[in-house]
Amino acid sequence: MGFVFPVHFWGLPAIVAEFLEALTLADAGRCFVYTVATYGTSTGQAGWMARKALMDKGVAVDAGLSVRMVDTWTPLFNLTDKEKCRRREASAEKEIDAAIGRIVACRGGNTERMRIPHVIAGVYHATYGSQRQTRHFHLMADRCAGCGLCADRCPSSAIEMRDGKSVWV
């Protein structure tokens, strides 16, 4: 049983933390359980947070893995260098293949890279809630078909339809 999630502010995204908190496993059996944290600069303590949430549900994590991806936090990282992004994506594909190999072989252990000490990651992750804002986001109104699909499917209810157009809320 696997849990794959991105790292946000060196921790778990709110939607993942909420999912793990609400998770009910009547009979998880004794299957191989793994986590994969995808990250840009650091895994922070996201893997530990996921393991703790699962342990609280009585589920032991056998393997903690990580895959470095293109960092998409645009206030700090320039995504216009297409070649640099392509190289990072190619490297990520190799890391994904290695993770798949470990999972298929049921090889346990913690191979998460680029962790940050708990206290530092905790302080930074505590700012996540105040930074999760959409006020600076915009949608291309001329490209919106008004179908409402984005608003219906947004897992955070961060998009609404107003006057037949989608808007961030």
Write out the residue ranges for each language-model feature.
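Iron-sulfur cluster-binding cysteine motifs and their immediate structural context
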Residues: 139-140, 145-169
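Generic structural signal for residues positioned in beta-strands
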Residues: 63, 138-139
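Short loop/turn microsegments at loop-to-beta-strand junctions
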Residues: 134-135
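FMN-binding flavodoxin-like domain, especially the glycine-rich phosphate-binding loop
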Residues: 1-5, 9-131
